[in-house]
């Protein structure tokens, strides 16, 4: 991508938009950043320091004089400004697409509905450990928080860019070409963006491997029914080596693709000759701070990537045994009077809540709720009825939750998280857990799940 001398519009003034603007200006483009709403003071300071033009609280006609446009992931394809860009025949790219054009490092792309951040963090941990031995650096970028654009020019050819990708980021990634790609799972989420069409959502995820070539590797989860149907049965052609990981029992049809599995208590890699190479014992990597079948699946995914990158088994074992989990993902906040308090604010859909309910031992008090995303709680009803001694429903969706579970488990509905924590503290007994797993978006009261999780932890510490 040649950007020197080009006029570029960046739509959206969040972290990725500002990072893209700074990168493009550094590479010689003339940039206008345009934000429909307000810009943060930090964003304005960074843009002013770099002498980048910007506008906020609306879009002017200037934005349509660009050679191309960088579209922030939160702006949907149906937004009027996007449709106007297309009407003006202005090419639209994601921030990921732009950054990848200037990336010298090896790229690992990770997407999926759940498990992206934990798996990306595991992969980054493996690469950091291997990099210390072999003289390269690992960069964890993308949807996890640090924009790809802000780090890409520092990356060297032997480095590794571990890139977490949402479906939104992949939509406008036209030529993005990771050497290793991974899909953790695909379950219903964000369907409002995709016209309630699950296939359209999946196809956005599948963009991750579309530009891969014969020497590259695509990795998928055989335990996910949608992925197994698409790739295990070869319904969708993949242009590179395709390998799988999984926990469920194998069939002969699956065996030829499964590379990483559990044999007894051991995570193993199946070699080309069928021999099993041990990597790490399950009970060495799973613990109170990092537990559950879903996290074991995340470990298998990371090992599959490590194997594709040529990371040695001993390096992987040492790195995995030292891993302590990721903030806001079944994070053990504190143990108070024999009660474990667990922050799972990242559970923004019902499937993520299900994983937490399966991982945390009964009995528990469950705090759930927020901005509903068309949730169907029937898929977790059996777990809640069996394991939850009290459901505290909070946020905008509290009445929907309370109505659905009325008569199934004891339910209390309160407006706010701090009220929910106070009630849980009064009711919890030694040997129980308090699990905060909202199954909803955070936008009813918070800017993001991180802010929500931090508030929950603050509330917990106040009752210490």
From Swiss-Prot:
<dbReference type="GO" id="GO:0008764">
    <property type="term" value="F:UDP-N-acetylmuramoylalanine-D-glutamate ligase activity"/>
</dbReference>
<keyword id="KW-0067">ATP-binding</keyword>
<keyword id="KW-0133">Cell shape</keyword>
<keyword id="KW-0132">Cell division</keyword>
<dbReference type="Pfam" id="PF02875">
    <property type="entry name" value="Mur_ligase_C"/>
</dbReference>
<comment type="similarity">
    <text>Belongs to the MurCDEF family.</text>
</comment>
<dbReference type="GO" id="GO:0051301">
    <property type="term" value="P:cell division"/>
</dbReference>
<keyword id="KW-0131">Cell cycle</keyword>
<keyword id="KW-0436">Ligase</keyword>
<dbReference type="InterPro" id="IPR013221">
    <property type="entry name" value="Mur_ligase_cen"/>
</dbReference>
<dbReference type="GO" id="GO:0071555">
    <property type="term" value="P:cell wall organization"/>
</dbReference>
<dbReference type="GO" id="GO:0005524">
    <property type="term" value="F:ATP binding"/>
</dbReference>
<dbReference type="InterPro" id="IPR004101">
    <property type="entry name" value="Mur_ligase_C"/>
</dbReference>
<feature type="binding site">
    <location>
        <begin position="112"/>
        <end position="118"/>
    </location>
    <ligand>
        <name>ATP</name>
    </ligand>
</feature>
<dbReference type="GO" id="GO:0009252">
    <property type="term" value="P:peptidoglycan biosynthetic process"/>
</dbReference>
<keyword id="KW-0961">Cell wall biogenesis/degradation</keyword>
<dbReference type="GO" id="GO:0008360">
    <property type="term" value="P:regulation of cell shape"/>
</dbReference>
<protein>
    <recommendedName>
        <fullName>UDP-N-acetylmuramoylalanine--D-glutamate ligase</fullName>
        <ecNumber>6.3.2.9</ecNumber>
    </recommendedName>
</protein>
<keyword id="KW-0963">Cytoplasm</keyword>
<dbReference type="InterPro" id="IPR036615">
    <property type="entry name" value="Mur_ligase_C_dom_sf"/>
</dbReference>
<dbReference type="Pfam" id="PF21377">
    <property type="entry name" value="MurD_N"/>
</dbReference>
<dbReference type="Pfam" id="PF08245">
    <property type="entry name" value="Mur_ligase_M"/>
</dbReference>
<keyword id="KW-0573">Peptidoglycan synthesis</keyword>
<dbReference type="GO" id="GO:0005737">
    <property type="term" value="C:cytoplasm"/>
</dbReference>
<dbReference type="InterPro" id="IPR036565">
    <property type="entry name" value="Mur-like_cat_sf"/>
</dbReference>
<comment type="pathway">
    <text>Cell wall biogenesis; peptidoglycan biosynthesis.</text>
</comment>
<dbReference type="InterPro" id="IPR005762">
    <property type="entry name" value="MurD"/>
</dbReference>
<comment type="function">
    <text>Cell wall formation. Catalyzes the addition of glutamate to the nucleotide precursor UDP-N-acetylmuramoyl-L-alanine (UMA).</text>
</comment>
<keyword id="KW-0547">Nucleotide-binding</keyword>
């Amino acid at each position: 991508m040649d950007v020197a001398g080009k006029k570029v519009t960046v739509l959206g003034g969040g972290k990725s938009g500002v990072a893209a603007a700074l990168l493009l200006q550094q590479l010689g483009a003339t940039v206008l950043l345009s934000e429909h709403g307000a810009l943060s003071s930090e964003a304005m300071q960074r843009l002013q320091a770099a002498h980048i033009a910007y506008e906020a609280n609306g879009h002017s006609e200037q934005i349509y004089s660009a050679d191309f446009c960088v579209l922030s992931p939160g702006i949907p394809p149906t937004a009027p400004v996007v449709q106007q860009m297309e009407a003006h025949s202005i090419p639209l790219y994601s921030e990921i697409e732009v950054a990848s054009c200037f990336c010298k490092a090896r790229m690992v792309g990770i997407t999926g509905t759940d498990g992206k951040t934990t798996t990306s963090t595991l992969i980054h941990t493996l690469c950091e450990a291997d990099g210390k031995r072999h003289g390269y650096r690992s960069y964890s970028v993308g949807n996890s928080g640090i924009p790809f654009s802000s780090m890409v020019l520092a990356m060297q050819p032997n480095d590794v860019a571990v890139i977490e990708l949402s479906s939104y980021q992949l939509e406008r990634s036209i030529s993005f070409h990771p050497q290793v790609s991974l899909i953790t799972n695909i379950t219903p989420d964000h369907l409002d963006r995709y016209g309630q069409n699950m296939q359209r959502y999946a196809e956005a995820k599948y963009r991750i491997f579309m530009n891969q070539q014969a020497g590259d590797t695509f990795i998928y989860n055989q335990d996910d029914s949608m992925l197994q149907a698409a790739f295990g049965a070869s319904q969708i052609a993949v242009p590179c080596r395709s390998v799988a990981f999984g926990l469920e029992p194998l069939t002969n049809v699956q065996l030829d693709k499964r590379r990483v599995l559990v044999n007894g208590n051991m995570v193993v890699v199946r070699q080309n000759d069928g021999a099993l190479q041990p990597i790490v014992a399950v009970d060495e990597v799973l613990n109170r701070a990092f537990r559950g079948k879903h996290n074991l699946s995340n470990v298998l995914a990371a090992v599959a990537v490590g194997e594709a990158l040529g990371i040695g088994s001993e390096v992987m074992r040492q790195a995995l045994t030292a891993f302590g989990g990721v903030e806001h993902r079944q994070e053990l906040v504190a143990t108070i009077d024999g009660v474990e308090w667990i922050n799972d604010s990242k559970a923004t859909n019902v499937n993520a809540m299900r994983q937490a309910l399966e991982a945390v031992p009964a009995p528990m008090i469950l705090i759930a709720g927020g901005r509903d995303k068309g949730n169907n709680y029937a898929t977790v009803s059996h777990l809640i009825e069996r394991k939850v001694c009290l459901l505290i429903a909070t946020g905008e969706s509290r009445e929907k939750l309370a109505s659905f579970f009325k008569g199934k488990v004891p339910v209390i509905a309160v407006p706010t998280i701090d009220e929910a924590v106070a009630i849980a503290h009064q009711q919890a007994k030694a040997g129980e857990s308090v699990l905060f797993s909202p199954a909803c978006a955070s936008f009813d009261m918070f800017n993001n799940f991180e802010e929500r999780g931090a508030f929950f932890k603050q509330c917990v510490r106040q009752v210490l």
